[in-house]
Design a protein with these regions (language model features):
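Noncatalytic alpha-helical scaffold of FAD-dependent oxidoreductases
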Residues: 1-200
Length: 200
């Protein structure tokens, strides 16, 4: 599990207007809520098909004081996926983890200036916490990825911010005309098969 979890895990309460105009309020404006079904999570998963979200209450965390992103390039999808599994089974507390295809790596590198090896699958691992904790975690990530044959490099500051902004906003406004943009949930073990299918 990544550091902050998903939207549904951060949601405490919400107000939704349903298709018939009725208003549904669910959850509570406190962290502890154990009464009845947790319908707000159902509305989050519906992606707007069950009603229009008009109000939401979220659990907040302070902005970490220190952040670093580790990059590693892999010659094959199998190697990069094995590294993902090792990271997820480790004690690393990741803020973000991105598994990047060669085509996406090329696009992101051209827009941000962040170095990525051509033709490689990449992993980007973001660690954010107090300085000592980040340094210790980066060292742990370096060891894990190094055991999978990857050369790891670290970015920070403006380069790090521009990279994650680009990843967040993909595919961006310059996506090819006529292309559809889809969101899909994939079981981690099936990621290599999905990548391969999309690259065909």
């Amino acid at each position: 599990r990544l550091r902050y979890g998903t939207t549904r895990e951060l949601l405490i309460g919400m107000k939704v207007v349903k298709a018939d105009g009725t208003v549904f309020s669910g959850g509570a404006k406190v962290v502890k809520n154990v009464a009845g079904y947790d319908l707000p999570k159902l509305f989050v998963g519906s992606l707007g098909t069950l009603g229009v979200l008009v109000e939401a209450t979220f659990r907040l965390y302070p902005v970490p004081e220190y952040s670093r992103t580790c990059f590693a390039g892999f010659g094959s999808l199998g190697d990069s996926h094995a590294a993902v599994q090792s990271l997820l089974n480790s004690d690393v507390v990741m803020t973000s983890l991105e598994h990047i295809t060669p085509a996406l790596a090329e696009a992101v590198a051209s827009r941000t200036g962040v170095f990525m090896k051509r033709g490689c699958y990449h992993l980007a691992v973001r660690i954010a916490n107090v300085e000592k904790a980040v340094r210790d975690q980066v060292e742990l990530v370096n060891g894990i990825l190094g055991r999978h044959g990857a050369e790891v490099y670290v970015i920070e500051g403006g380069d790090e911010s521009s990279f994650w902004s680009e990843i967040r906003d993909l595919p961006g406004g310059d996506a090819e005309e006529g292309r559809a943009v889809c969101k899909a949930g994939v079981v981690i073990n099936e990621v290599p098969a999905v990548f391969k299918a999309l690259e065909m």
